[in-house]
UniProtKB/Swiss-Prot annotation:
GO terms assigned for molecular function: antiporter activity; GDP-fucose transmembrane transporter activity
Origin species: Dictyostelium discoideum
Protein name (database record): GDP-fucose transporter 1
Higher taxonomy: Eukaryota, Amoebozoa, Evosea, Eumycetozoa, Dictyostelia
Keyword ATP-binding: no
PANTHER family associated with the record: SOLUTE CARRIER FAMILY 35 (PTHR11132)
UniProt membrane topology term: Multi-pass membrane protein
């Protein structure tokens, strides 16, 4: 019996030891499995983070590429438009600025119609509204279109009589007129710093004009009128936007269509229609190519500004405009050989610097 009991105790002890060993092994296996799982999860997290970092880097590179592209597009369109119009008016010696403006408005109108027609099928143009033209809306928009028409006409007239290097100075008093009209029409006062910036621009205008080698009173007068209409348009457009549901692109449809009708009678009254048919350039394919491209540029400038603000910011748009003015002046000196006196150069720098200061000041005031 004792021997039998001893055997049973030994057997039970062995079983217990086996169970303990098995339990320990199971626990060790569980720990190892947990470690393997944790390491696997850690590797997955690291891989996920690496993938996310790569995606962010690609987005950043893509974003920088997009920003650089839209700014370059704005520079190209804006400077090309000025140069093309100068070529038409001076190099071709086509002395019919009203006809040039009228034809370019027609090209812009055709461009608008095409772009709005395909906007639904082209995601990049989804911001454009459907084409429409209602007489009731047109009558409300008419006063603003008249201002815009004056602005475009005097722009081209100014460019006909001044050098491209002086063009920025001749039209520089826009912010000064804006300050005056804002006070008279909107009863709104401008801050001290913004006013000082306007004075810097005015001083630059005076110095630049006095130092201009190829000075033209007509160019100065047309530049002043252009500046006045630009300032007036920026105020008047705010009052008419409700008529087009606050959509500036819809307003551009009406502006372009109505301006075509407004400019045509001016061509007749000015006398351009009496002699234009005798102009040999009307039978030149090169001339019409330049005219058409300039018309396309006139519409694309609005698109380029919109894209620049969309992908950057209003502040970047302001800085870009200032740099563009510098580049435009330099290119005018290089390609056209426009002579610049020291006084004229100081005036140009004051105008560009003052305009930049004013824009920056207004931007930060609006953010408050």
């Amino acid at each position: 019996m004792n021997i039998q009991n001893d055997k049973e105790r030994l057997l039970n002890g062995s079983i217990d030891e086996i169970e303990i060993i098995t339990t320990d092994n199971n626990e060790n296996d569980t720990i190892r499995n947990d470690d393997i799982l944790k390491n696997s999860q850690l590797r997955e997290q690291q891989q996920h983070q690496q993938i996310q970092q790569q995606i962010q880097q690609q987005k950043k590179e893509s974003s920088l590429s997009t920003i650089a592209s839209v700014i370059a597009f704005y520079f190209f369109i804006s400077i090309s438009l000025v140069f093309l119009n100068k070529i038409l008016l001076s190099d071709f010696k086509f002395e019919y600025p009203l006809f040039i403006t009228w034809y370019q408005q027609i090209i812009s109108f055709v461009s608008i119609y095409i772009m709005t027609s395909i906007s639904k099928s082209v995601p990049a143009l989804s911001f454009l509204p459907e084409f429409e033209f209602k007489s009731a809306t047109a009558s409300k928009v008419l006063p603003v279109t008249a201002v815009l028409t004056g602005m475009v006409i005097f722009n081209n007239l100014c460019l006909e009589y001044v050098e491209v290097s002086f063009y920025q100075v001749a039209r520089s008093l826009t912010i000064c007129f804006s300050l005056i009209l804002t006070y008279i029409v909107l009863k709104s006062k401008t801050s001290y710093r913004a006013t000082m910036a306007c004075l810097v621009v005015f001083l630059g205008f005076v110095l630049g004009s006095a130092g201009e080698v190829n000075f033209s009173w007509l160019g100065i007068i047309f530049g002043l009128l252009s500046s006045f209409f630009v300032a007036l348009y920026s105020i008047a457009v705010k009052r008419v936007l409700p008529a087009v549901d606050g959509n500036e692109w819809r307003l551009s449809i009406y502006n372009t269509a109505i301006s075509i009708g407004l400019i045509f009678p001016l061509i007749l009254v000015s006398g351009e229609a009496n002699t234009i048919l005798d102009e040999p350039l009307l039978y030149s394919g090169t001339f019409w190519f330049y005219m058409t491209v300039a018309g396309l540029m006139g519409y694309l400038i609005s698109i380029s500004v919109f894209m620049q603000i969309k992908h950057t910011s209003p502040l970047t748009n302001t800085i870009s405009g200032t740099v563009k003015a510098c580049v435009q002046t330099i290119l005018a000196v290089v390609f056209w050989g426009n002579p610049i006196s020291t006084q004229n150069a100081v005036g140009i720098l004051l105008v560009i610097g003052g305009s930049f200061w004013y824009s920056m000041q207004r931007f930060f005031e609006m953010k408050k």
